[in-house]
Curated annotation (Swiss-Prot):
A lipid is attached at residue 261 (GPI-anchor amidated asparagine). It comes from the Eukaryota. Residues 262-287 form a propeptide. Keywords: Cell membrane, Disulfide bond, Glycoprotein, GPI-anchor, Lipoprotein, Malaria, Membrane, Merozoite, Repeat, Signal. Residues 54-112 have a biased composition (Gly residues). It comes from Plasmodium falciparum (isolate FCR-3 / Gambia). Residues 1-20 form the signal peptide. Residues 150-180, 187-215 have a biased composition (Polar residues). Disulfide bonds join 244-252. Residues 121-149 have a biased composition (Low complexity). This is Merozoite surface protein 2.
Length: 287
């Protein structure tokens, strides 16, 4: 009887320790899987689509750039017009403002009526002197001390010169925009047979493993066939791995978590059964 009692006690402790280790192992894996699933779901929910962010950034950047450019142009034009008028003096300031307005009108594309641009008031060039070139600025400042009629004639000539320069620049731009010759398109039919030859080994790789492992393959073709036979073997992948490779991150690891749940349940049931059996035996022996 003493031997049976000691054996039952030893058996009880062995079963308890063994089942505690198994339960802790399965519980740790279950907790880790649940934690990983929660992290994946939170990542998928927190990451917004890239298209919306790109369009929002583009619109915001465009509006900000336009407003900044407009404000900078207005402030620069105002400061330039004010300084030119102040340095020229009373009557000379008026003529300088008129010449600056005429040149600005030609730069903005209003060259059809340069006289109207030249006859503007001295206060108007503050907003139109932003697009004038260095030649226009020199012409306007050099004619600030002369008579107004002479200033108007010289501004008309400067407007004509700027129009001619703009026409020359447009011609050069149209010449630079000529599309290149389509040599690559004429050479493309010659590349098609090479593509067909390159596609031939891929078709041979899709053959059965018996034909690919045959010793008849010689030269460099054998190396390619060996790779094809290795790559064409079916891989023993589980459902969870297929879901992970397909891109379903939400379902990734779902099957493994279910298996772990079932194993946890089985281990718990086993643990309960063993404890109950050992307790029954121990009480029966001790009593």
């Amino acid at each position: 009887m003493k031997v049976i009692k000691t054996l039952s006690i030893i058996n009880f402790f062995i079963f308890v320790t063994f089942n505690i280790k198994n339960e802790s192992k399965y519980s740790n894996t279950f907790i880790n899987n649940a934690y990983n699933m929660s992290i994946r779901r939170s990542m998928t929910e927190s990451n917004p689509p890239t298209g919306a962010s790109g369009s929002a950034g583009g619109s915001a950047g465009g509006s900000a750039g336009g407003s900044a450019g407009g404000s900078a142009g207005g402030s620069a034009g105002g400061s330039a017009g004010g300084s030119a008028g102040g340095s020229a003096g009373g009557s000379a300031g008026g003529s300088a403002g008129g010449s600056a307005g005429g040149s600005a009108g030609s730069g903005d594309g209003n060259g059809a009526n340069p006289g109207a641009d030249a006859e503007r008031s001295p206060s108007t060039p503050a907003t139109t002197t932003t697009t004038t070139t260095t030649n226009d600025a020199e012409a306007s400042t050099s004619t600030s001390s002369e008579n107004p009629n002479h200033n108007n004639a010289e501004t008309n000539q400067a407007n004509k010169e700027t129009q001619n320069n703009s026409n020359v620049q447009q011609d050069s731009q149209t010449k630079s925009n000529v599309p290149p010759t389509q040599d690559a398109d004429t050479k493309s039919p010659t590349a098609q047979p090479e593509q067909a030859e390159n596609s031939a080994p891929t078709a041979e790789q899709t053959e059965s493993p018996e034909l690919q492992s045959a010793p008849e393959n010689k030269g460099t073709g054998q190396h390619g066939h060996m790779h094809g036979s290795r790559n064409n073997h079916p891989q023993n992948t589980s459902d969870s791995q297929k879901e992970c490779t397909d891109g379903n991150k939400e379902n990734c690891g779902a099957a493994t978590s279910l298996l772990n749940n079932s194993s946890n349940i089985a281990s718990i049931n086993k643990f309960v059964v063993l404890i109950s059996a050992t307790l029954v035996l121990s009480f029966a022996i001790f009593i």
